[in-house]
Structure formats: C-alpha cells, structure tokens
Amino acid sequence: MAKVVGIDLGTTNSEVAVMQGGEPVVIPSAEGSTLIPSVVAVNKNGERIVGRQAKNQAILNPENTVYSIKRFMGRKWGEPAGRELPVEADAKRKPYKVIQGNNNEVRVVMGDKDFSPPEVSAMILQKLKSDAEAYLGEKVTEAVITVPAYFNDAQRQATKDAGAIAGLKVLRIINEPTAAALAYGLDKKKDETIAVYDLGGGTFDISILELGEGTFQVKSTAGDTHLGGDDFDQKIIDWLIAEYKKDQGIDLSKDKTALQRLKEAAEKAKIELSTVQQAEINLPFITADASGPKHLNIILTRAKLEQMVMDLVDKSLEPCRQALKDSGKTASEINEVILVGGQTRMPLVQQKVKEFFGKEPNKGVNPDEVVAIGAAIQAGVLKGEVSDVLLLDVIPLTLGIETLGGVSTALITRNTTIPTSKSQVFSTAADNQPSVEIHVLQGERPMAADNRTLGRFMLDGILPAPRGVPQIEVTFDIDANGILSVKAKDKGTGREQKITITASSGLSKEEVEKMTREAEAHAAEDSKRKEEIEARNVADNLAYNAEKTLRDNKDKIPAELNTELESKIAAVRTALQGTDVDAIKTTTQELSTALQSVGSAVYGQQQEQGAPAQEEPSAEGKKNDDEGTVEGEFREV
C-alpha cells in the first residue's frame, strides 16, 4: 500500500513524516536535516532552488529569495485585516518584490516571473515530496497537510491548491495544534484536558482539547495568523536599524542586501539569547559611505530583547483567554500545557505561559517535529494503519450570510465540531423580488463589510410575492478539512443553487491545473538538469583518472592503447564542452571500456615479467597471509 505522508508546511521551516512499523518517523532531507527552510529562490542562472540551499544564498540574492510565503496564503490586497497585518504593510517589510495581481490577489516576483503564494508553497511541498520519495524508495502521491487552527477558508483552500500543484492529493487538512495533540496523546491512557500553545515562525494558535479513550476532541481554538517568530525578528531588525542610524547616520532599511543580513543576524541572536545572557551582532561591511566601508557591531542582551518583545508575548495571551472562555474551562482545569513551535524555546515565552496557566509547561515533545508527527499519525488513521483514534476538530471562525441592512447573520458559530451541516430559512426584502444574492461571509464582526467574503451567488426564479413570504432555505456544509459548501433553495418552487467555496484562495480550478502542469514540467526539467550534472561529474572524474593513468604508466601501456586512450579522453572533453547528455554518456562509456583494456594490459605485462607463482594451499587448507588475491567490494566515490 502506497505511503501517505504528513507534512508540516511552516512559515520558517517545514517537515515531512511517515508511519513506519506503527511508529511516526520524521524524514530527513537530502541535506541530512529534518528541518527544511521554507525558502524558495531563483538564482542568477535562472535555476529554481528550495530549502537550505535557497536560504544560504539569500544574502547575495535578496530580491529573488522568497521566505515566509505562508503569511500571504489566501490573502488579498485591501481586504479587512482583522488581527493580521494588512498585505500592503507586510509587503513593504520584505526585500523581495510583492505585487498586486488580477482580482487583488498577492503575487511575488522571482527572476523574470511572478508567482502566486500557492505556487511558491508548492515548490516547498515538491522538495518535501522528493525527499520523502528518496527516503521511502517509492512514489508519494497523497498527504495530510497541517495549517494554523486560525486559518480561514481562503487560507485552507490555498493550502489545498498548493498540494495539488505539487502533485499531491491532499487527503486531509488538519489544524497544527490538533496534530500536536495527536502526537502527544497517542499513547496516553488517562482522560485529561490539555492546552496546545503553538507559537511558530509566522502564526499563533491556542487550542483546548479533551483527550480520553483514543478520542481527541477540540473544545475551542483561537489565535492570530500574524504573530510568530518573524515578528520577534522584526523587533530586533527595527532596533538594529534605529541604533545604527543614531550612531552612524545611515538608514539601513533602504538597502535590501543589508536588510537580508540584518534578518539573518537577528534570528541568530534571538536563538542564542534563549541559552545565554547576551549576544554580539557583528556585521562587517554592512554598508559604505564617502569615507569608506562601514561595519555594525552591537551587543544585545536578553533583558533588552525581552523588553522589545514583551508586547508580542502578551498579545499571545488574549487568544488564550478567549479559548478558555469558549471551552468553558478555567486555567486550573488544564492538566497539561504543550508547547509547540520554535519560538516557544524563548525563556520569556515559557515564563509567561507558566504564569498564565499556573503550571510548568510540558517540554516532553520536540516543538519543531511534533506537528509533522501528528500529521503522519492522522495519515495513518485515514489509511487504517492507526486504529482506535477519533479526531473531532472545530471551525475557527463563524460562517454566515449578509442579510437586510448589511448585517452578518451567523449560521455556524466558531468552535462548532466538524464535519457539520446547518440550514436556516430566510425571505425576501422587497415585494415581488425575483432573485436573491447569497453573500457568504466568515468572521466575528456584526457587519458584513467587516468580515471576509468567501463567495457570492444568485438564486433566480422566485415567484412574485409580498416581501417576507418566499421561503429561501440556506444550507451550509463543512467537510472534515474545514472547507465550505453553500446551497440555497426556494422551498416554493424547488429551484436550487449551490456553490463550493473553492476559488476563495484566489485561484480558479483551471489556474490550479495549469500551475500543476507547469510544476510537473519544472520537476522534469530539474530531473534532466540533475541527470546532466551527474553525467558531467562522472565523465570529468573518469577523464581525470584516465589522464593520471597515462602519466603514471606511460612506459607500461602499449602504443596503440595509449593512442586509443588519448583519443577517448579527447572525445569526453569535447562532449563536456557541449550540452548533449547522450554524447557525454556515450563517450564516457567508451572511455571506461578503453581504460579497462589498458588496465588489463598493464596487469598482463606485470605477470609476464615474472610475478611469483601462487603457492598451493597446504593440506590443512592454510596459505600465507600476504599471498593470493583478496576479492573485495569497491564502490564509486
């Protein structure tokens, strides 16, 4: 049975895991690490690179290196931001170019092309898929992907689109805190109530769950999709810019290369300050003026960092209060607090969580790996590899429609267990009204204009009647992924209209299919390029070894073989100057054959020149330790 992988598609880093022998295993990348930076770039040669390699070249190529793309998933220019930073403001913080596309969707520029956020996320997913296939030795076509619990419908749909573009059938979208709870509670036997405090690179979630007898029931969830490690880094960056401007009179915020260096230095200092009291930020040649090169050297203490980010940590506690209130629990009723996300390693975060819940947080899970592990467990549940587990998740935001006066009328309130369905009867607002527009909304605000529009559709053919008489039944259906379908039916005529909110990510079905084809084509190009590089490396190494053999054994190689070998080496060198991979492979094979002939000739000459005969074994079957030929295994390096 084909394996289904679990993927934690993170803002800063991503991971992939799988069930093996009944246990979840985090899969290492081709580079050897389980954490893959969520970074994509197009280098100066026009090549697309992903992960650690992309992150390593970011300083030299800031304008074509995209990071934190998750913050733009499912977002549009000019939409109500709620707790989130408006797209326009977030775009200004990035050294890469963020532009407004058709229908106000977000696009990012790399090289000479612009891409949608799902396309960029798909590149990260393709890297994870490729690493998983290399590890498992088989094709991977299905996945469970995690999202922040507080992601709205558009952000969830954008994640599904990214999976499709990457060539993955997304069996389930699962909330990150719920995945973490699965990983924590799979082998727990006792009933308990837990809080999952998930502060990652770009998002914050808090979920309250009840665990018992293999059932994981989410009671409430709250969060902020624009609060995470990126914001902590930004505080340090802003401080460094201000300090440098005060000291040197130079504004580093205008220099994209300097900004990228500041970002990396800020992240490094922040991580260091989780274990030490002060960190030195030393950036030589950060900029230059008329007097010559300028350097940056500043000491940042843990105390200063905590002052800078205190408001961010406090900001995470408001959703915690909301989640407790919605669950009907008090802090004292929480048995365990699970910390998830790399930012929870910060001592200040741990201290604040301890003070809020009145207990020491549980540090028994790896905050970086626990979400991917939970996703793999959910994949195992869906495939029947894991039994006796029931997961009951909830929707994070209220769903409703616009009614008379621009009011948002709720049909399904937040924290309702999914999958679910809810119907409600509405009527017309005017006499003889022939049609109604169903304006589908998501959010907690009382007025429609302040909430997010998920979709609109018309129900026509309503029979003439006084206002308030026609009965229009509106039904909301939410599947286990939290994806919404809406149906409107005129009970008088039986006329019906329905919509599945699939384009709320900003991409139509046709666009997703087109991007999928492009991604497949690019994967084929990558494979071809890799094949060419490997062929070139083999050819170059073989030609080098052949040249060395000629130099070292010139007096031992017969003249005709010498000439043939020189000819074959020249053929390989000529092929390497071109782009024909088949020619490189053919000439390499011919050179290999010629080299074997030379080897046989040299060894034959040595034997003819009187090599001592091999002694027969004695009656006891023994022979001298240093005699005879020892067969061994050799491998190409």
Curated annotation (Swiss-Prot):
Residues 619-637 have a biased composition (Basic and acidic residues). Residues 604-616 have a biased composition (Low complexity). Belongs to the heat shock protein 70 family. This is Chaperone protein DnaK. The gene is dnaK. It comes from the Bacteria. The keyword Chaperone applies. Induction: By stress conditions e.g. heat shock.
